[in-house]
């Protein structure tokens, strides 16, 4: 059985990237929460 995690930087950025987060209301809420928490990295 192959491993389920096949890393790809492009796929990661497109799915979990900043622009993707900002494109939806829920995503903006995530960014807001991470800012409030003081995360160094807000998104992938």
Swiss-Prot record:
Transmembrane segments: none annotated. InterPro entries: Ribosomal_bL34, Ribosomal_bL34_CS. Keywords: Ribonucleoprotein, Ribosomal protein. Coiled coil: none annotated. The keyword Ribosomal protein applies. One of its GO terms (biological process) is translation. PROSITE patterns: RIBOSOMAL_L34. One of its GO terms (cellular component) is ribonucleoprotein complex. One of its GO terms (molecular function) is structural constituent of ribosome. Pfam families: Ribosomal_L34. Disulfide bonds: none annotated. Gene3D superfamilies: 1.10.287.3980. Belongs to the bacterial ribosomal protein bL34 family. This is Large ribosomal subunit protein bL34.
């Amino acid at each position: 059985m192959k491993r389920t995690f096949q890393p790809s930087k492009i796929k990661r950025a497109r799915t979990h990237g900043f622009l993707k987060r900002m494109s939806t209301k829920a995503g903006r809420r995530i960014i807001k929460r991470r800012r409030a928490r003081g995360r160094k990295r807000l998104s992938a």
